[in-house]
Amino acid sequence: NNNTDLPWHICSIIDDTSDVNLLNTRVLGELERGASSFELPSFSKNPKRVLNKVDLSIAPIYLRNLKCNENEIKDFVNFLLEWRKINKKDPCAGIDVDPIATDIWNNYFSNSNNNSKDRLKDLISLKENSQNNLINVNFFHFDGSLWNDLGASLIDEISLLASSLIELLRIYKNNNKLKVSFCYSLGTDFFSNIAKVRASRLVLTNLMNHFEVDLDITHIGRTSSSLFYKESPWINQLRVTNAGLSGAIAGVDRLVCHPLTSKLGQAPEFVRRLTRNTHIILQEESHIGKIQDPSGGSFYLEKLTEDIAREAWKRIKEIEENKGITNLIQNKKFLNHLEKNRNNEIDKISSGQIKRVGVNTYQDPNPREIKVKPYE
């Protein structure tokens, strides 16, 4: 991931626009002002103009379009191959589209018709066809934030990520030194966020030992969609900072913080700056990244980490005893379980049983409006 000088990659989300020159300006603006990597929501426009003057060998690009089809991913890979040929350097990049969770997420939250039962096999085929030329590109990404959106509990999130990896290892045998990334949702529970990432490391290490493989794993923290409310955009920033700090302490390799206006529309420049500066302050003023394991030795967190890892391991065994994750995601009982969890949390927030500052408690009597442009 070319992340040799930073504790974690500061990854900026680039708001999409039909104006390719503006899109290029946004990418360059983020990189020039503190971001070290960036995430594009689509790859259907003119990529040469969008990425003009961007050195992908030092600034990784990640494609995260949950509605993309196989052709868009192929176009992305072909562009990276062409970029390598022209620039004589290896691009750093990732396809941040979970081959298992994405389709389920789309069924609930979008009207996309690009679902594919063979998404994992398609990625394996792309990987095999280009692996010698794209050594710094990650083709396999498993996204706990999608499962979190769907209603997965903390234990569910870890076990579903681990079971997704098992499915990959079951299908793809040429997997030594394989690059795989795991994304974790960072919510309002500070200590649980830290313990979740640490517990997942234990679980994944056990799986690698079991399968006798040596994977190149990237751990990613992403602010959960449950942090953001239209009613309290300014308070959203407090929740983002809390979640970002927990991800930093957990030792993620890349941190993605959504702007405080993410539920309203495109982030204005001052909001994008605030989001970048959240990372920069954590890195350069708190110096958390200079400590190998900031939470190591804390009895509470060590015990919580172990308890979560043990429960997740039990759940993984249950999933595998029932023919793995591909069988699980077709089980209506499991899907109903996720939906019930999601609805329960919404009901508890509506009733005030779960407190959200600025939403159902301590509302701002004179909220300051933030003017935003709608998403394109």
Each model region followed by its residue ranges:
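Catalytic-core signal marking the mid-to-C-terminal active-site face
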Residues: 273-376
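Catalytic alpha/beta core domains of metabolic enzymes, predominantly
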Residues: 181-188, 192, 196, 214-227, ...
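Mobile "lid/hinge" segments at catalytic clefts and subdomain interfaces of large enzymes
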Residues: 136-167, 245-315
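Catalytic alpha/beta active-site cores
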Residues: 1-190, 211, 216-220, 254, ...
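Conserved, mostly hydrophobic/aromatic
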Residues: 34, 85, 204, 250, ...
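Short glycine/threonine-rich loop-to-helix capping motif typified by GTGT followed
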Residues: 152-158, 188-199, 225-238, 265-275, ...
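Extended, hydrophobic alpha-helical segments in both membrane/secreted and soluble proteins
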Residues: 200-203, 207, 241, 277-278
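Non-catalytic terminal/interface segments that mediate subunit docking, oligomerization
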Residues: 1-23, 27, 31, 239-243, ...
